[in-house]
Structures are given as structure tokens and as C-alpha cells.
């Protein structure tokens, strides 16, 4: 297996984490892979000429474009965001090569949006392959609850709701703050909301916390390197995003066996459903009710159920098994027509 990174500087750390027989960094800047990408196509052709390959996996639209034009191989194109086929040119390209192309969305939500954009495609060529984590590797990085709280400067005994993500409209931390405000009167007085991350709304969100009268109960940590190491500092993890394509941070929270509260939209809801609490996006009253429910249930958290769902649906092993069982992939391995 050969893995090629179109963009980014060479990195030994990335190469080691890639788990590939060979890792090649082409070193393009993002601005250099706009347009026709003829040089990148030529380089991929040179790489392909050195060996015998069964198929190509391409993450996102630009690598898919390069893979399709550089080879005659079947291409498995993985999509991590919505509206990847909003442009006519992208729809035209994949329609041109439909006979040797499988599209995978990282959630049913992304998959369904692609199917709506490409209504003439058979459903068997637009499927779901969830994101995944190495559960044991992630868990090995966690600090203990006490150590994590000490590092973040948090009190040892407070009940803490955690949120991790960019401070951006898409993450809707404004609803998170309002929901916490609504719940706080029924929570212990020393309860905290901890928001880990930075972004363009940092100043506005801090002002909102002041306006709501909860600034003393909200901690903005800013960016924290290797933030997931400190997830055990939290008692509950809350994600309030608007139509999240997936929500990798939820998997990391599940690895810490944290109770989950999530907006009922996008891929995040698919991750949480069955082991967490969902609320309508933007509904701070419903979010407050979820927070209170999690507090009242704090002695009865079913950590085993959370970890079981993580292992069975979103672990490396589960997603790898799902990939090799995809009908498109099975036909490739059996040298059957796709």
C-alpha cells in the first residue's frame, strides 16, 4: 500500500501514523492544487507505473479528481463534508467516471446529502463508512480525572460539563451557554461549563457569558495541546453543533466513557443515538433539561454501553471490517465487474 499526501510538508510523525508500506509527500500548497492540477496528475501516474495496484482511495474532492484523471483504477472517494457536489463541475466529473467510482460519506447524513445531489446514481455506489479511532491508543493517552483537572486548573469536586471545538457559529456555543444558564439554578452552585478551543467568536461568547450572569461558572481554556488527554476532567460532554458531518470529538469522549449530550442533527446524532441524550438544535430549554437529566443520572452512567457502541461501530476494527465487506470492494477483490 502506498499513501500519497498532495499537500503538507513531509513529516516523520505523520508517516509513522499512516501505517502504510510507503508514504509520499508531494508538498503542494493548497493554492497549488486548484484548477487542472496537471503536475500532480503526472506525479501520480509516475507512482502508479512503479507497481501493480488494485484500486485507489481518495479523501475529498481534489484528490478524487487527481486519482480519476491519473489512472484507470477503480476509485473509492471518501467525503467528510456537506455540499461536496454543489458545483456542477464536480457533479459532471463524477458522472463521467461513475462506472469505476464509489462514493463514501463519513455518516448517513453526508451520504444522504450526496445521494440527493446525484439522484441518478444507484444507492449501492453512494454508501456510508463511519470515521473511526484506535480506541486503545486514545484511552492510553487519557490522564486521570484528578490529574486532568489539576492541569486545567479546575476544582477537584465540581460537576463539570465539557465542550471541545472551534468557537464558531457552526458549533453554536451560544446555545450551550444559554442552556447552561437555564440549568444552573437546579445544579450544584459550584458546577462548571468548560469550553476548550479558540475561534472568531471567543470575545462574543465571553461577553454572552457575562450578559447571562454565568461568567464565574464558565471556563474558556483556549487551545489546549492534545486536548483529548484531559477529557476525564469532565463529567458530561456536550456538543451543540449545527449539522455536524460527523463529530470525531464525540468518539474521543466515548473513549473516556463520558455521558453525551448532542444536538439532534447531522452525523453527531448518529454517533450518540442509543447511548446519549439528544436535543433539538438551538433549543436551549431542551438542552438545559438534558443537562439536568445527566446530573440526576450521574451515579448510573452505563460506561460499558458507551464503550460497547464505540467498539462495535466506530473502532478501527469495526470500520475496517465494514470497508472490506462493502459490495463494491468485494467485487474488486473477486475481480468481478463493478
Q: At which residue positions do the language-model features occur?
A:
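Conserved acidic donor-binding segment of nucleotide-sugar-dependent glycosyltransferases
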Residues: 274-284, 293-299
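Short His-centered aromatic/hydrophobic patch
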Residues: 57-64, 79
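Aromatic "clamp/platform" in nucleotide-sugar-dependent glycosyltransferases that forms part
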Residues: 223, 242
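A conserved, positively charged/aromatic
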Residues: 76-106
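N-terminal strand-loop element at the rim of the active site
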Residues: 1-36
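A conserved mid-protein helix/loop that constitutes part of the nucleotide-sugar donor-binding site
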Residues: 159, 163-184, 200-207, 285
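A short, active-site helix/loop in glycosyltransferases that binds the activated sugar's phosphate group
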Residues: 101-127, 133-138
Amino acid at each position: 500500500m502506498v499513501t500519497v499526501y498532495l499537500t503538507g510538508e513531509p513529516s516523520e510523525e505523520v508517516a509513522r501514523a499512516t501505517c502504510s508500506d510507503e508514504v509520499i509527500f508531494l508538498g503542494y500548497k493548497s493554492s497549488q492544487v486548484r484548477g487542472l492540477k496537471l503536475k500532480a496528475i503526472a506525479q501520480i501516474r509516475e507512482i502508479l507505473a512503479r507497481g501493480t495496484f488494485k484500486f485507489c482511495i481518495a479523501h475529498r474532492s481534489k484528490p478524487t479528481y487527481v486519482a480519476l484523471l491519473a489512472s484507470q483504477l477503480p476509485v473509492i472517494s471518501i467525503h467528510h463534508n456537506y455540499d461536496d457536489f454543489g458545483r456542477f463541475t464536480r457533479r459532471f466529473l463524477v458522472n463521467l467516471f461513475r462506472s469505476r467510482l464509489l462514493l463514501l460519506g463519513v455518516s448517513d447524513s453526508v451520504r444522504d446529502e450526496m445521494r440527493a445531489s446525484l439522484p441518478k446514481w444507484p444507492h449501492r455506489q453512494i454508501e456510508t463508512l463511519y470515521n473511526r479511532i484506535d480506541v486503545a491508543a486514545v484511552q492510553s493517552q487519557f490522564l486521570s480525572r484528578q490529574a486532568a483537572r489539576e492541569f486545567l486548573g479546575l476544582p477537584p469536586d465540581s460537576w463539570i460539563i465539557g465542550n471541545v471545538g472551534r468557537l464558531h457559529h457552526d458549533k453554536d456555543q451560544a446555545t450551550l451557554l444559554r442552556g447552561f444558564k437555564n440549568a444552573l439554578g437546579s445544579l450544584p452552585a459550584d458546577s462548571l461549563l468548560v469550553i476548550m478551543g479558540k475561534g472568531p467568536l471567543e470575545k462574543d461568547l465571553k461577553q454572552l457569558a457575562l450578559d447571562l450572569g454565568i461568567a464565574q461558572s464558565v471556563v474558556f481554556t483556549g487551545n489546549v495541546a492534545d486536548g483529548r488527554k484531559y477529557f476525564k476532567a469532565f463529567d458530561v460532554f456536550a456538543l451543540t453543533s449545527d449539522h455536524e458531518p460527523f463529530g470525531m470529538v464525540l468518539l474521543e469522549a466515548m473513549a473516556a466513557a463520558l455521558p453525551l449530550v448532542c444536538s439532534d442533527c447531522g452525523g453527531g446524532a448518529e454517533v450518540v443515538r442509543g447511548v446519549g441524550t439528544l436535543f433539538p438544535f438551538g433549543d436551549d430549554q431542551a438542552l438545559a433539561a438534558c443537562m439536568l437529566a445527566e446530573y440526576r443520572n450521574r451515579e448510573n452512567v452505563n460506561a460499558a454501553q458507551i464503550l460497547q457502541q464505540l467498539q462495535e461501530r466506530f473502532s478501527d476494527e469495526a470500520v475496517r471490517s465494514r470497508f472490506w465487506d462493502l459490495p463494491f470492494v468485494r467485487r474488486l477483490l473477486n475481480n468481478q465487474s463493478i
